[in-house]
């Protein structure tokens, strides 16, 4: 180990041994000194390490099949949508890694439009993709956006959410994913341009065009318009992947008319239902134009994929199969109180039926289970005599209380204790 000073009493760098006269700067710490040259060397080593991590993060992009396989672990069904998303995401990051040009051929950006009913898995798919790729991710609601100059959020606020998700690391944010939900709500109210100002419709589509395509945007770090004198953050949106999603209620009749079918036909109910279910998969850009999206906006979303409404079987699978399945989560929570939880098959089907009746899809499953489990989860942590709790179909319908199996083998119905 180097001494802190030599025979002449000159201070030395504790790492390289150079004296204070041989270097430009010597920084003192508790019982240790480091020179500017060693600081520079350490900085280079750290930057090299961070650079290689960044390289792995964006260059080792999983292949489309690998992406689809990971999506399968978290999202049930929607195979066509998963395939389309896997290919689009893979191509997007391949394009980034090739610097957008191969042999003077410029590769276009693959922004994605997902069309599907509420609770069909649009947001979950986008979130899971960002987790697979380990990139910053932000969700924005199109209904809160308005044109500049009107009350509401500017489109730049979407970019601020992504920058915040990347901990203000602009380089990372520039390779992130933004999911814009309820995109159908900014459609023009009429197919023909109106003289009346459409503050939250066509104007917002126009405002989104540049950031979807790729531009250097100026983002207010504090958001909104309340701080006009703040310095702006510059961010290049060229390599940000935008995924837009919406239910697009009213799109099916437009597709039917294009296919030459009457909106109200004479086919059997079963056949009509099958056709209705498959209609969204036949969507074309021209249908979206008739719905109220402007041509330039549709052109910025080249990948269009549709999600099917989830049927009873799919909802039951969602409850039990994914890695983060709701039933597994509730089982784990009760397990922490030394109680085993069991949902009977018919109970799961009853929960699925309720979600379909409410038209909430997978999104409504948690609130249904929460309502069933609330009293049980309030009471059981205070009881030490319960070994197992069984949720039956009658429990879900509200006809009977959950069954409790005590440690001595006795089976009783749960009785809600009311406070005096």
Curated annotation (Swiss-Prot):
Coiled-coil residue windows: none
Alphabetized UniProt keyword annotations: ATP-binding, Chaperone, Metal-binding, Nucleotide-binding, Zinc
Binding site for ATP: 117-124
PROSITE patterns for this protein: CLPX_ZB
Subunit composition and interactions: Component of the ClpX-ClpP complex. Forms a hexameric ring that, in the presence of ATP, binds to fourteen ClpP subunits assembled into a disk-like structure with a central cavity, resembling the structure of eukaryotic proteasomes.
Family: Belongs to the ClpX chaperone family.
Role noted for this protein: ATP-dependent specificity component of the Clp protease. It directs the protease to specific substrates. Can perform chaperone functions in the absence of ClpP.
Protein name: ATP-dependent Clp protease ATP-binding subunit ClpX
């Amino acid at each position: 180990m180097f001494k802190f000073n030599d025979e002449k009493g000159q201070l030395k760098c504790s790492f390289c041994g150079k004296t204070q006269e041989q270097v430009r700067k010597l920084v003192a710490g508790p019982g240790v000194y480091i020179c500017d040259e060693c600081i520079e060397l350490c900085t280079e080593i750290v930057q090299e390490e961070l650079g290689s991590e960044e390289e792995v993060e964006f260059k080792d992009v999983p292949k489309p099949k690998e992406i689809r396989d990971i999506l399968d672990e978290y999202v049930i069904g929607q195979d066509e949508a998963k395939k389309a998303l896997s290919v689009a995401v893979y191509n997007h990051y391949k394009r980034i890694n090739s610097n957008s040009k191969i042999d003077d051929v410029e590769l276009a950006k693959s922004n994605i439009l997902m069309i599907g009913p509420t609770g069909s898995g649009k947001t979950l798919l986008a979130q899971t993709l960002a987790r697979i790729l380990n990139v910053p991710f932000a969700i924005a609601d199109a209904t809160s956006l308005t044109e500049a100059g009107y009350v509401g959020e500017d489109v730049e606020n979407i970019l601020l959410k992504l920058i915040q998700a990347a901990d203000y690391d602009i380089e990372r944010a520039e390779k992130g994913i933004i999911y814009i939900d309820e995109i159908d709500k900014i459609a023009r109210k009429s197919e023909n341009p109106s003289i009346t100002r459409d503050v939250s419709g066509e104007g917002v589509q126009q405002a989104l065009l540049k950031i979807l395509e790729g531009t250097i945007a100026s983002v207010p770090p504090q958001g909104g318009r309340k701080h006009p004198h703040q310095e702006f953050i510059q961010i290049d949106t060229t390599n940000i992947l935008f995924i837009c999603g919406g239910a697009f209620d009213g799109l099916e009749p437009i597709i039917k008319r294009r296919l030459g079918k009457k909106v109200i036909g004479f086919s059997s109910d079963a056949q009509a239902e099958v056709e209705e279910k498959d209609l969204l998969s036949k969507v074309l850009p021209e249908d979206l134009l008739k719905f109220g999206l402007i041509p330039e906006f549709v052109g910025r979303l080249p990948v269009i994929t549709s999600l099917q409404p989830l049927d009873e079987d799919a909802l039951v699978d969602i409850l039990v199969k994914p890695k983060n399945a709701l039933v597994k989560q509730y089982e784990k929570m009760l397990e922490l109180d030394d109680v085993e939880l069991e949902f009977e098959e018919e109970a799961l089907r009853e929960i699925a039926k309720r979600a379909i009746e409410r038209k909430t899809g997978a999104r409504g499953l948690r609130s249904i289970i929460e309502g069933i489990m609330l009293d049980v989860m309030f009471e059981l942590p205070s009881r030490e005599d319960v070994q197992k709790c069984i949720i039956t179909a009658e429990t879900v319908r509200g006809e009977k209380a959950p069954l409790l199996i005590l440690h001595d083998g006795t089976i009783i119905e749960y009785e809600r204790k009311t406070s005096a």
